[in-house]
Amino acid sequence: RVQDTVDRGLAQGGEVADWAGQLSAAINDIAVLTAELWGSGQFDVVLANASAYLEAFGHIVLAWIWLEQAEAAAGNPGDFYQGKLQAARYFFATELPKTGPQIALLRSLDRTSLDMQANWF
């Protein structure tokens, strides 16, 4: 279903197609990352940074939802539809890009959280 939304967005053209391309790239990034993380065999390190993974994945899901709404709103007059498009613009300009640093952190297999010791509190 997500790929159907991306395909519709790409076919629609304009800024909706740009957003569809951004979403497609983010989906690819998280899919590649997931394979890398589980392939690393370092499950303790991977799970120590689970909150960053969940946040990135959640942003990608929300981008999909905003893309669906933008596809429905594009070309329709009225404040309601313009508001939907502006909200999608905001999300794709400011929120979806946050997945890049999260994915980079996850890819680095950072041990900061895992290496914390209880007696250091």
Report each predicted region and the residues it spans:
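C-terminal amphipathic alpha-helical interaction region
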Residues: 1-121
